[in-house]
């Protein structure tokens, strides 16, 4: 049975949905136990005088009655409940908040837009990799937060009065998806962005991170359609045209777009296009967390690590009792191989990091069983929470682990969208070779070998007489030559006297 003192809960009463996150603290990290989301559309219940309707408030209270059961075994001081844009502006918010606090047995805090932006940034900083300057964009139901910062430190916090629910009611109220409706929605968003745009552009950023349901929906669409994970303006424009072709909200069908997200997708899309155009954003990635994660990490008082991925890898290695020395051995060899072929094979630093991550986790499948360990490894990584990695990167690493040895299955490599397929193929080849050469699990048995490429042909130069002195690994290498040939990956061995041996 879980000790109640290890449980934490964060509840976000948003303008579109109410969310609850329940986690357990484990050795300085969090394990997600439950995520509950209910579409309440509170903002849709605001009238022209900014008063919430009784029906909208009842929808919210009913949702909180459901949430309250989860909270009974969690200490009150380990629960944070916040309300955002709609309850900031509703004239009768006090009525809703009083009853909501009573239902939950915990105070509901209506937070300012700036505080919301700060919490969103904290959630992103704790869960999304990279030490670069960031621009974080979160399109909510009633407001949009824009935050710049580096590491744990924010430099600008902005909360703007536009959201996917309010824009739905204002610019798509007839439920028509027309050029005119989109143009009006985008123009209105640009007008709100105009006073802050220059300041944000001058501040600058190296990576743009999206932390909202709209961005999550875009990721799901791109995955379903086999696109890479980077969100760009041309992709947004293509999706807008597809929406316009559907004509009506009720008839909106885009591959990968769920029914649940469809209603507010066009309005969120219009706001996002306006943000891209106004701020000249080249591309955007999906955040690993936002407001609720910011609340949880705030209660835990955990420092923000610069290298979130390393923390994630350490935690998983510890949890699954992975042989860290062997993982490091394979990492070192793979790094050695990577350096030698990266230029000719056009492999960048992003490739290097993902290859290293796969090396760190390659033996995770042994925690289930030796037989079919690569399949077990792939399954585990596909379903584990990996802070610092995007969903596409997680799928890529899983595809690497599936193909770390044995017969090569190209399907998962072809289906991932984190890297170009040729780069994924090349990294798998390096991983497989590093595992073979490190198979004796001793540092003093690693050969001083060289790799070079001729287009897709990979040539390994071994020390003189190495093959004769290491018959088991030599046999594994000859088998590997055969396995790679089945998928048209030429692999050749030679010894330093230039004699070709395979």
UniProtKB/Swiss-Prot annotation:
Pfam families noted in UniProt: Ppx-GppA, Ppx-GppA_III
GO biological process: guanosine pentaphosphate catabolic process; guanosine tetraphosphate biosynthetic process; nucleobase-containing small molecule interconversion
Keyword terms: Hydrolase
Substrates-to-products reaction catalysed: guanosine 3'-diphosphate 5'-triphosphate + H2O = guanosine 3',5'-bis(diphosphate) + phosphate + H(+)
Lineage top rank: taxon: Bacteria
SUPFAM superfamilies: Actin-like ATPase domain, HD-domain/PDEase-like
InterPro entries: ATPase_NBD (IPR043129), GppA/Ppx_hydrolase (IPR050273), Guo-5TP_3DP_PyrP (IPR023709), Ppx_GppA_C (IPR048950), Ppx_GppA_N (IPR003695), PyroPPase_GppA_Ppx (IPR030673)
Pathway entry: Purine metabolism; ppGpp biosynthesis; ppGpp from GTP: step 2/2
Protein EC: 3.6.1.40
One GO molecular-function entry: guanosine-5'-triphosphate,3'-diphosphate diphosphatase activity
NCBIfam families: PRK11031.1
Similarity annotation: Belongs to the GppA/Ppx family. GppA subfamily.
Protein role: Catalyzes the conversion of pppGpp to ppGpp. Guanosine pentaphosphate (pppGpp) is a cytoplasmic signaling molecule which together with ppGpp controls the 'stringent response', an adaptive process that allows bacteria to respond to amino acid starvation, resulting in the coordinated regulation of numerous cellular activities.
Identification of the protein by name: Guanosine-5'-triphosphate,3'-diphosphate pyrophosphatase
Annotated organism of origin: Proteus mirabilis (strain HI4320)
Taxonomic path: Bacteria, Pseudomonadati, Pseudomonadota, Gammaproteobacteria, Enterobacterales
